[in-house]
């Protein structure tokens, strides 16, 4: 079901109010500490150096995630480069931040894509990917979702937060030495993660979501 809501005010990506949560830990299997994932570090860098109008640094940092831009293009047929390059050449900070936010959304989708492609059979990988998707949302997108909720009287942030909890519960468990293992619920995972995607598209209607994947 498609939901249409009339916003009381236009949503402008509130980079100046971006809340970054610092926490300890490591992303097993990916080799990154929390908050050290390239998507997170480059997004934060774009915000920081954008406010200083350091476009040389912004270009340099975005170049380090060219492979991630290519990844989402190859999977979802969304080429973010033309709009991103336009924003960079025009020194249009708002445009660059919007494209970066779109990249975050597509990277969240990419985590779901690989989990679904593997049928949730690789428990540790599936758990790490989902946690990264949750971090991307919490650190980089949730501030604007909360702002949207405040303007429109919605509760999308709470709903998305709860959906991530539901998604974790669908992964099952390896148990202890195989005892007490719980099988994953792939169909439930697909439904829950699709709901997260749809809610984000309501808040960020300018996001390109790409082609639907047939598994």
Q: Where are the regions a protein language model picked out?
A:
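N-terminal signal peptide c-region/cleavage motif recognized by signal peptidases
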Residues: 24-26
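Bacterial N-terminal signal peptides that target proteins for export
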Residues: 3-13
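Bacterial N-terminal signal peptides
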Residues: 14-22
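Mature extracytoplasmic or organellar-lumen-exposed domains after removal of signal/transit peptides
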Residues: 28-215
